[in-house]
């Protein structure tokens, strides 16, 4: 029972990696065939195809290296990191792979490399995430001032909630001071 979760994660990772291999080989193969049957193909277009797919291959290599399970016979030795987890760096590698495949779809359908401009979304998105992370650990001047104001307001508020509620009721119910049963 103890190794059941590890075996489950290992089989899930193996399926994900196998699916990635199928998708990459399908779309890249179709893009290569499309360039082969095109009439006006230059060496520069082949170099572009290779150069623009290098980030995808690096991301795929890192995913396989870190997520591929290792077996010793029928026993799982290492299950790899969880590839279904969206909170780690692996999710960005998946995004990079899918954006590269989108660029290959542009080659397949329209014989253009303009779809590869979508790869600029990766560093922009990473910068956005890093900026949010920076603000979480190193707040700016505006956030520091707002925190100081809220601390001062909390220090000035020395009365408990019950006392404040009594004062409010006292202001509204000034006619009735005692209630008998």
Curated annotation (Swiss-Prot):
It is a multi-pass membrane protein. GO terms for cellular component: endoplasmic reticulum; endoplasmic reticulum membrane; intracellular membrane-bounded organelle; vacuole. One of its GO terms (biological process) is vacuolar protein processing. The chain crosses the membrane at residues 16-36, 46-66, 90-110, 113-133. Disulfide bonds: none annotated. Residues 168-181 have a biased composition (Basic and acidic residues). It is found in: Endoplasmic reticulum membrane. Residues 1-15, 67-89, 134-181 are cytoplasmic. Keywords: Endoplasmic reticulum, Membrane, Protein transport, Transmembrane, Transmembrane helix, Transport. It holds the Pfam family TMEM208_SND2. Residues 144-157 have a biased composition (Polar residues). Disruption phenotype: Exhibits cold sensitivity and leads to internal accumulation of precursor CPY. It comes from the Eukaryota. Residues 37-45, 111-112 are lumenal. Residues 144-181 are annotated as: Disordered. Functions in the SND pathway, a SRP (signal recognition particle) and GET (guided entry of tail-anchored proteins) independent pathway for targeting a broad range of substrate proteins to the endoplasmic reticulum. SND functions in parallel to GET in targeting proteins with downstream hydrophobic motifs. Involved in vacuolar processing and morphology. Belongs to the TMEM208 family. Interacts with SND1, PHO88/SND3 and the translocon complex subunit SEC61. ENV10/SND2 and PHO88/SND3 form a complex with the translocon in the endoplasmic reticulum membrane. This is SRP-independent targeting protein 2. The lineage of its organism: Eukaryota, Fungi, Dikarya, Ascomycota, Saccharomycotina.
């Amino acid at each position: 029972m103890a190794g059941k979760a590890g075996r489950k994660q290992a089989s899930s990772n193996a399926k994900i990696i196998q699916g990635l291999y199928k998708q990459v080989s399908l779309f890249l193969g179709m893009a290569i065939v499309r360039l082969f049957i095109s009439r006006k193909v230059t060496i520069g277009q082949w170099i572009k195809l290779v150069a623009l797919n290098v980030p995808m291959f690096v991301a795929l290599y890192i995913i396989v290296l870190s997520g591929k399970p290792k077996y010793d016979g029928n026993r799982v030795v290492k299950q790899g990191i969880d590839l279904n987890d969206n909170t780690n760096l692996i999710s960005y590698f998946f995004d990079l792979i899918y954006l590269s495949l989108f660029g290959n779809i542009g080659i397949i359908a329209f014989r253009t490399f303009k779809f590869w401009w979508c790869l600029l979304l990766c560093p922009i998105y990473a910068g956005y995430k890093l900026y949010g992370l920076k603000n979480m650990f190193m707040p700016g001047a505006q956030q520091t001032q707002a925190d100081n104001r809220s601390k001062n307001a909390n220090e000035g508020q020395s009365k408990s909630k019950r006392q404040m509620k009594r004062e409010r009721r006292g202001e509204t119910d000034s006619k009735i001071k005692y209630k008998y049963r």
